[in-house]
Amino acid sequence: MNKYLAELFGTFWLVLGGCGSAVLAAAFPDVGIGLLGVSLAFGLTVLTMAFAIGHISGCHLNPAVTIGLWAGGRFEAKEIVPYILAQVIGGVIAGGVLYTIASGQMGFDATSSGFASNGYGEHSPGGYSLTSALVTEIVMAMMFLLVILGATDQRAPQGFAPIAIGLCLTLIHLISIPVTNTSVNPARSTGVALYVGDWATAQLWLFWVAPILGALLGAVAYKLISGSNKD
């Protein structure tokens, strides 16, 4: 039970910290943190939680990561469903807390503001198509898993995995916020989309399918590039 609670709290922190920075601080007049700040916020949530709960649950915080680690031979199949349930619950609770805070500002409307939801077409920050969004999310998730598997490999320098993984997520956001508002994490997308409804839930399928597919590809890619070094 401890590891499931760790995943719940960890994903809560990721959604509250990352999406919270986007909703509350990104465009704050004069001192808003902007795209760079939001990207760093997401990376910092993973970095801090990796040190806090990595020894308890492995600090997945992401259904795609959980499935990718299973595909990479690092995780048991029987744990996939409870991990994903804990992650989604944590994300949804964080979305509710953030919605409560944001609603305290006069004129706030989750649907019209987007509430840090992920989208494509007219709901992409840069107006990118479904195809662009699909390719972006698959490739970003693939690279994320490759970095995770590499950084946590027993042959890698020890103690630096949280830094590498946190910086990787920051870089992913710097690249892809203009395209999809960056998901690579179905729990993160679900956690805010449920409070927007409408278009956000209609487009949510892509932010489950693409990250999971990308994570599976990342697991395959890491096996290909690391296999010859095992002996």
From Swiss-Prot:
Membrane topology of the entry: Multi-pass membrane protein
Compartments where found: Cell inner membrane
Short motif NPA 2, span: 185-187
PROSITE patterns: MIP
Chemical reaction(s) catalysed: H2O(in) = H2O(out)
Site label Involved in tetramerization or stability of the tetramer, positions: C19
One Pfam family matching this protein: MIP
GO MF annotation: an example: water channel activity
GO cellular component, one term: plasma membrane
Keywords: Cell inner membrane, Cell membrane, Membrane, Repeat, Transmembrane, Transmembrane helix, Transport
Feature type site, description Selectivity filter: F42, H173, T182, R188
Motif window: NPA 1: 62-64
Signal sequence segment: none
Major location category of this protein: membrane
Transmembrane segments: 8-28, 33-53, 80-100, 130-150, 159-179, 205-225
UniProt note: domains: Aquaporins contain two tandem repeats each containing three membrane-spanning domains and a pore-forming loop with the signature motif Asn-Pro-Ala (NPA).
General function of this protein: Channel that permits osmotically driven movement of water in both directions. It is involved in the osmoregulation and in the maintenance of cell turgor during volume expansion in rapidly growing cells. It mediates rapid entry or exit of water in response to abrupt changes in osmolarity.
Protein name listed in UniProt: Aquaporin Z
